[in-house]
């Protein structure tokens, strides 16, 4: 194998390792919490699972100290309302009307547990993750309302496209509050509407707040290639996507205003996000951390709407949208600008989005994500064929120069400067770029990395089958057949390459496929499938270039001769 090809493979491997190291640096593993014994409160009862923390808009430091969150008991069943649609199973706590549980029946936890849906929101103390919303008074303090509903169970029946859950209650200051959740068929976006009727004799001032409260989850023990971002994020017209890691929230609270925007909590494949109801208004975004002794901290991120002024005898309304579901670009893009960036495609996000569009377009025809990966890879190799052919021909010319370069080495002996000048003069005379074999191949490296992110982060490939024994393209091949095929494809590619006279390079020809087979053995099957297809197509392209190399060289020589005659 040509030494430049070896260098290219090593660069790709080093890039992968560098990405891993950067990821580890930015998102270090969370230490395991020390087990603690739950202590009852002073009156002998456990406090409720959570309460909306107090805050003062515009004063992040005050939010650190305001409010507490109870960590030792779950919401009583008597307070829960259940809502079931075709894509969501939700539980609402009538105290505050907050969503304390959200499951996704169309997304099983694993292929082995198909009856167990993925749960995003949970009121369980050890995995607290709830979507809260409510009203504040004129002092910025939240008011807790005990709501009532017409039913305890709501189901989106066949033939229905919309399900409305209406909660009513009276606030401590006498306001009549109606909180309405609207669910739609095949939709993970939940519309929230608040209506306030001021039946008192005094004017009322207040705001809508929405927030996500989450205990920092334990680090998932995956291999580095699936170490996806897990934490908070937000977007605004100025900054469409900004990660807010738990570590950064520990150091500094969010305290800023923005027109429209959104706030979210991310995990691999799924997220929850609050989106303001009116993109023309300016909202205050905030966060604070609630320390938990011996356990991971609890993090709160949210926003507050502009203040409403409701005269006595009048009413007002405000609204927002909660998204709880999979990270699907077309769904997220329609909710808020930049929300689709929560699909964490990394620093090559634009390329990844383009590749996913191509991949999904192919899938719309072939209906199989494995075949879609193969076809998309072939299309990529066709697009980059000119670069590959240029690289192959450049390497072939360099091999032709080896006897002449060897002669220069013998002539100049240990005089390295003279050898370097003579070598560069030879390259100039023969119109050879010594980097011509590497650069065209390096241009393709960003595409490989971008496609890597597409396969790792796209929820559409989660539990997607291919053929035969491959039932999930997002996890490793259970029988390691694909990594072995990949190693064999590398051997075939090297066998086609002219043998180098250098014994060291000859050894590398046989060692490198083994190294890459081991390196890829735990990679997702979809990524290995891409690499196999890439190798096979590249081998065929190299075979064709080698076959036509002499005729290409003759045509090039004739073209240069015609130019000299002119």
Swiss-Prot record:
The terms under GO molecular function for this entry are: membrane insertase activity
Gene3D superfamilies, per database record: 2.70.98.90
CDD domains per the UniProt record, alphabetical: 5TM_YidC_Alb3 (cd20070), EcYidC-like_peri (cd19961)
Please provide the record's keywords in A-Z order: Cell inner membrane, Cell membrane, Chaperone, Membrane, Protein transport, Transmembrane, Transmembrane helix, Transport
Q: Provide an example Pfam family for this protein.
A: 60KD_IMP
Residue ranges spanning the membrane: these are 3-23, 346-366, 369-389, 436-456, 509-529
The UniProt entry's GO biological process terms, in alphabetical order, are: protein insertion into membrane; protein transport
**Does the record bear Metal-binding in its keywords?**
no
Give the way it sits in the membrane. Multi-pass membrane protein
Question: Where is it predominantly found?
Answer: membrane
Q: Which cysteines are joined by disulfide bonds?
A: none
* Family stated for the protein in its record: Belongs to the OXA1/ALB3/YidC family. Type 1 subfamily.
Please describe what this protein does: Required for the insertion and/or proper folding and/or complex formation of integral membrane proteins into the membrane. Involved in integration of membrane proteins that insert both dependently and independently of the Sec translocase complex, as well as at least some lipoproteins. Aids folding of multispanning membrane proteins.
Subunit info here reads: Interacts with the Sec translocase complex via SecD. Specifically interacts with transmembrane segments of nascent integral membrane proteins during membrane integration.
Record-given protein name: Membrane protein insertase YidC
Q: Lineage of the source organism?
A: Bacteria, Pseudomonadati, Pseudomonadota, Gammaproteobacteria, Legionellales
- Gene name in the database record: yidC
